[in-house]
Structure formats: structure tokens, C-alpha cells
Amino acid sequence: ILEKIASDPEDNEVKGVEIRLWEKIKTKAREGRRTGVGITAEGDMLAALGLRYGSDEAVDFSVDIHKQLAVAAYGSSVVLAKERGAFKIFDVEREKNNPFIARLKEASPEMYQEMVKYGRRNIACLTIAPTGTTSLMTQTTSGIEPVFLPVYKRRRKVNPNDKNVHVDFTDEMGDAYEEFIVFHHKFAIWME
């Protein structure tokens, strides 16, 4: 990125702002080694297990899953710190009153003691990122939420001059679309 900015035609004064920004990003990334293990399709998992979204049983099950995921992710980061060293700005004292770290300590006292001794390789190990496109590709729910709609209508832009094209909708700009019905993959399996 810095090489690309250097080759840009703008004057150095203009480029300096962007260069300083990217240098700060690079420094912070190296100091913390942020990473993120996350989930997708949890809503489908709950449905497949017959657990109603929002029920006490489903909430308890999800809490347990996320607790196991957190302990495994942070435990792996501790193992890496033992082998390669902790992230640069790791300081166990700064985290001693952190509620999340307290929950990790309660869930796995052994892992916590190793973390105190060796640190972690990564400042953060979990993420719940937006997975809308990924869930469309994998035909699953995007997270813990249930399916928004088990059946919905999609539009695909088409060239009306193509052979054998079917135009169902034309927008105010004159763009043509074919419409088709989509069934959520797991819902379609359930219907069979």
C-alpha cells in the first residue's frame, strides 16, 4: 500500500496524510496481531437441533458453544505465545479487571494461568462479522438469528436483447430483471 501511495501523482504533502495513516495501521497491527474466529449458520444449527430461537434452552446452548469457542481460540493464542512470544503490548495487569478475561478465567482456570505466564499471541481472537454474502454462498443463516424469510423473490439483471431471456421487471432507469423464487436451502430440505 505504501509503495502504491508513493507512486501516486499527488504532491507529497497530500500523500503524507495517507502515508501516516497507513503507517499507524501497520504499527497497531504488528503490536496487537488482531485476528478473529467467528461463526455462521448458528440459526440453522439451533433449528436442526429443534431448539426454538430465543428459548432458554437455545440461549443456554449458544452460550455454551461460544464459551467453548472462546476458550479454544484464546487457548490456541496462548500456545502460540508460548512458542513465539506474546503480542508486543501484552500486559496482564491491564486486563485484570476486564469482564471478558474474567469469564475466560472462570471457564478455564488452567488456560488463564498459562496466559498470565506466557501471554497471548493475539490481542483479540474472536469476531462476529457480518456474513451476509458468505451465508448466501453457503446457503445458511448468517449468525444466530433465524432465517429472515424461508422463501423470497430475487431479481437478476438481464440484457433484454439476449436470446431466450425472460424479463419480469423493468426499473425506472430501464434496466431489465428476471425474477425468481428462492427457498432457504435448509427450509427446502425440510420441505422434502
Q: What residue spans do the PLM features occupy?
A:
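Long, C-terminal-biased catalytic regions of enzyme "large/alpha" subunits
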Residues: 1-192
